[in-house]
Amino acid sequence: GSKIKPDSSGAWNNLIFPLQAMKLQTPEIEELLSRINPKASSMHVQIAKSVLRFSLYQGGKNAENALNEVCNLLSKTDNRSIKNLEVTKKESPPQIIGPDNTVALVHFGRSGTGLLHSLIDDHTEVSTLPSIYLSEYFDHSTWERIISGGWSKMADRFMAIYDVLFDATSTVPVQTKSNRLISNIGRKEGMANVGDQRDEVLSVDKTLFSAELQRLMNCYDQLDAFIFFKLIHRAYDKAINDTTQKNLIFYHIHNPDTHAQLNFVRSTPNANWVMMVREPVQSCESWLGKAFEQNNYTEISNKISDMLF
């Protein structure tokens, strides 16, 4: 048999399609999974196999059990939280938005999530970040990068990873599914030509954001990815001079990697989910139109296969 790197998320994602196809002939999912025996047995490998199991059970009667198994494993991982070794407790923790008041938006193939997001993002009681930059924020590798320099560097590392959040013309790539990178996403998402004349660039003052984020962080003796996520929203609102009280976080998670999505579910199991759908033929036409014009059969077939499985 062929060998794969057991810690490669891309390799694990690539197993989903053939196993979904094989499932049509071999319905016993555990039998299919028994053929995958990576030599490494690290927690990361255990989680990757558990995520794969969930993907195969999704939509079936055992999906909930598979989900609980993944969330249980994710809750045992190292580095889920980071301690503030210089905690001063000068201020009490701010009234941050509760986990129950979070809405996550996912798409189903060119269904108009960007339009819905744009209609919601100016609501005075809603805190939201622009575009889909943070779709992979809850992937374990993102949090590891943010905390890798210690507590004092978290704000700087976040701003470096998501530079496009502060300047839509930034060429710094952001992570997408299977650890792939998208460059110039701000321009591609239309954030570099906003305003009435479409000649303005969406930008945010990093100095203001950083100062507010660090002030909020210093109220805590430790942080995990979800609390930090909420503080990011508070700091962003302050940086754009939005001081109104927020009651809800609207998270355009869009099309996350399964691992990132399940880690978000574990972090806030009571979040509300919205999946946006569109008239199927129109959705397909919008989704495949460019590849069809270019006569790119491979891209068309790959997109349809991804959607079906």
Model-derived features: positions:
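PAPS-dependent sulfation machinery
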Residues: I132-H252
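Structural marker of alpha-solenoid helical repeat scaffolds
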Residues: I4, I36-K39, L73
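Residue-level recognition of tetratricopeptide repeat
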Residues: F17, V51-L56
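PAPS-dependent sulfotransferase catalytic domain
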Residues: L202-F309
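Structural signature of tandem alpha-helical TPR/SEL1-like repeats
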Residues: M22-S34, K61-N65
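TPR alpha-solenoid repeat register
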Residues: A11, M43-I47
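Glycine-rich phosphate-binding P-loop
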Residues: L105-I120
